[in-house]
Amino acid sequence: NIQAKARDKRYSLLANECQKNNIKYLLLGHHLNDLFENFLIRIVRGSGLNGLISFSKNTKYRGQDLNIMRPLLNLEKKDLLYISNEVFSFFVKDPSNINEDYKRTRIRNLLYSLEKEGLDIKKLKLTINNLKDSDESIKFYVDKNLKKNMVFLKKKNIYILSYNFFDQSHEIIFRSLTKLI
């Protein structure tokens, strides 16, 4: 995927510059429409709950001491274009954004079609927020499972798991084990 490789390269260049200049916070211009495109792309890939809600406002960049922040996630693209035109009198157009060879462009166009069918921004945002709430509930039960049903022996560097550790839903067990790894 050319766009994914280009994005990874951009992130890497930005992260390297941040590291050179001791910058701890990198603000990106992702907006609400980007969030929805990403959500649908993840559905097409068959992502689980974590994948569907992975586009968060604040994340660490690959374990480094760099915080990636997306302060514009609540704004629609049309609002940002309006602000750009009114305040800066211009905005940069990326020709790949209209190139149908790219999945993201096709998904973006699908979103326009779905909007005509009644899937508006408010409903998509509500769906994503509901999924985030579900994820928070799962995290709560994962933490509870780890606290009640796991002991870490430092001297031997091993985990002891009780029988009850596995007496949970598949997702709780999976995420609990993932946290231990």
Task: Report the location of each language-model feature.
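Core alpha/beta nucleotide-donor-binding catalytic domains of modification enzymes
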Residues: N1-L110
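Non-catalytic, well-ordered alpha-helical scaffold segments
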Residues: E37-N38, R104-R108, K122-K125, H170-T178
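Internal, active-site/partner-interface "lid" segment
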Residues: N97-T105, K122-D133
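Alpha-helix boundary/capping and short turn/kink residues
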Residues: R45, L49, K77, E117-L119, ...
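AMP-forming adenylation/ATP pyrophosphatase catalytic core
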Residues: K9-R10, T59-D65, L126-I181
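Short, structured loop/turn "capping" segments at alpha-beta junctions
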Residues: F90-K93, L119-L124, I138
